[in-house]
Amino acid sequence: MKSQACLKVCLALIGLVSIVSTAYIANDVVSDYAEVKELLAAFYRKHAKKYGHDYDPAAIQAIAENMDKSVKNDKTEATVNRKLWNEVFENDIILTLPQAESLLSESNSPRSRRQAHPDPRNFWPNLTISYEFYGGEETWRQLIRSAIRHVEQNVCFKFKENGGDRDGLRYYRGNGCWSNVGRVGGRQLVSIGYGCDSLGIVSHETLHALGLWHEQSRDDRDNFISIVADKITRGTEGNFAKRTAANSDNLGQPYDLGSVMHYGAKSFAYDWSSDTIKTRDWRYQNTIGQRDGLSFKDAKMINTRYCSNVCQRSLPCLNEGYTDPNNCGRCRCPSGYGGTYCETVEYTSCGGSLTASSSYKKIESGIVQPDANCVWRIRNPGGNVEVMFDQVNFQCADPCQSYVEVKYLSQKTSTGARLCCSLPSVIRSEGDDVIIILRGTPNTAVGWRGFTLKYRAIGGTPITPATVRPTYATTTRPYWTRTASGWIHIKNPPLYKPDGQIYTSDEQSAETKYSSEELYDPSTFLSPSSSSASPALLLPSDASPQRPSAQEHDLSQLSQNALTRPTPTTTVAPDTASWSAWGEWSACSQPCGGCGTKTRVRACYGGNQVCPGSNLDRESCNAHACAKPKKGMICNGRLLLPCDLLAKLNFGSNNYLNPKLKQSGFARSSTLPLPRISQRKPVFVNELEVHPPTERFLSSSTRRVKRQTANRFCEKRFIYQCPTALLTIQMEYKPDTQGTNDAYFQQYPECCSGYTPRRGVCYKN
């Protein structure tokens, strides 16, 4: 009973420490953060008053906890970081002390259009940045490496794991997802906690570290979005404040509703059914908040800031492209555009370049395939293009996952309107072309019909129907498929007719020999609709897909010979089905130990959709032995307990992780540094000062000291990964049958059950 009472007292003491320190981001994790949070609270209080509200951290925390009970998730850091609303700025930004001071005083400063961090002291001096991991499992590390490769592919920075630079990034499993803005010196933390495990969120936090603020904090944001103030959680209105020239710079780039740095539509909402951000053009509503990866504009911001001197000369890029710092011989083009100088449509196996005429023409996507990536460019030189959708059929999501994107603005840098839920009204281009992009996710379910649209020329010098080739329907099976590190090419994919029949790679689609110009022409990747008099033109099976030449081949510019050539004969697709190419391998089911497996799948198309063999392929993976936990962690700790109680308790870990940590034996309670809950003096000291010591009081004090001396304390030393915002110690009574020395190997086996390690590799018994 006495031991149980002592255990309750110890647990109560630990619980009291936890209650007093409710912060999720401790001051020793981020330098000077206690002072930063005081300034941040003053900033939130100031902005709450502008809306007639008070800043009540307890009320905000209660709303956040209630929201966490919801299964809703917008796939942004906003969902994960609800409990951090009082700890961070704009959901995921860790401010430095100078930034916080500037933030509090900026409301009276002149405003200008700004968005990237302008202080040269926060710029990265080199284009190679060191990074390291601070704990975390291997699958988590691989995700971060994939996100870093994704960033590297789009900007001129290179990242070196475990590099020796003094300044760098340290990714660790903290509470939530957060980062500093710009370089702050030393190994600055980037927290990728549980729930932040996506390529887009890791990229988002990395771009913060490179110097980008959130997109919706730009001064010109009111031209593109409106803030629904009455839907925002009271007291968090300061998270919608706009930046000024004091701490950000737009670098002359337009506002991008598809930026990976943009808030989602429901950020800081007190009710998940409510939007706190509405786009001025409602067709963009499901575009904001995407976390698929960097947009063209996101990368252009970084490259404009850091990479303008990488190449010796600038290329004459079109359509707002710019010289690619990773390949100085080409331009980096906005989505939808391709070619050396961004003069053509982006190369895909489905889609192409089309010219509008005075009468409507039709584009049908067909059934949306997984990883579909198709791009069309519709032109009307000297005029505009009108687009009218008859069907938009995708899985509705906020933001869109699979979608049709329409770029109809005169500026090309920004992301287009992504449609997946609603049918838009008539769209008219601001310039002389429109870009249509079809995207499908890797896990797109079969059955979504995609989109159907019709287009025509408005103004300009439209071509009459008599001078153009028949209307073309399209397919959605890509030659290119998306991976975590970018788009990769699939050799010899199956070719499709509009009715869904398939031409496999070993079938000749036509006996007619085409010229090399025709094979390069994007129009040869299109097949006429069923109303056309001409049969499908299909790429011969022995020809490898080629990228378009530098000069774009428009349908209206085909030679007369091409328009009048004899109708080619085609081989009718057999009634039997055929397999598609294998998809990518899944992640391994185990990080090590020998028993892991990975799988890949393929689809059966055409005919009766019955193909020989299995659609599933399985392979063993990660046969290497599991590494034992390393000793020598950064921080040591100790727990003070009565010695007779300590011997009866089990702990969540053991000291086999570090044999150097031994129990240090007995120690007098008067010399032990007990936890300091507050700055108040002990109660019995106050009593001594206020009242003269009586005989009764002295007798009581003597008995108390005797009890403490007889009940000597022992210390339980332990190690833990630090910095940490929350340290949990698990204790329970040992079962009578349990020994005191658990085998280290039993707790941390090198191989799975049924496998034996030999020279670092696990083999099946």
UniProtKB/Swiss-Prot annotation:
Residues 576-627 form the TSP type-1 domain. Changing residue 214 to R: In ox196; induces defects in protease involved in ecdysis. GO terms for biological process: collagen and cuticulin-based cuticle development; ecdysis, collagen and cuticulin-based cuticle; molting cycle, collagen and cuticulin-based cuticle; proteolysis. The keyword Disulfide bond applies. Disulfide bonds join 156-307, 177-196, 311-331, 333-342, 350-374, 400-420, 588-621, 592-626, 604-611. The keyword Disulfide bond applies. Residues 1-22 form the signal peptide. GO terms for cellular component: extracellular region. Zn(2+) binds at residues 204, 208, 214. Disruption phenotype: Worms exhibit incomplete ecdysis; at each molt the cuticle fails to open sufficiently at the anterior end and the partially shed cuticle is dragged behind the animal. Residues 526-545, 562-573 have a biased composition (Low complexity). GO terms for molecular function: metalloendopeptidase activity; zinc ion binding. CDD domains: CUB, ZnMc_astacin_like. Residues 513-573 are annotated as: Disordered. Residues 115-308 form the Peptidase M12A domain. SUPFAM superfamilies: Metalloproteases ('zincins'), catalytic domain (SSF55486), Spermadhesin, CUB domain (SSF49854), TSP-1 type 1 repeat (SSF82895). Its main location: secreted. Metalloprotease. Plays an essential role in molting, a process during larval stages in which a new cuticle is formed and the old cuticle is shed. Required during ecdysis, the opening of the cuticle to allow the worm to escape. This is Zinc metalloproteinase nas-37. The lineage of its organism: Eukaryota, Metazoa, Ecdysozoa, Nematoda, Chromadorea. The gene is nas-37.
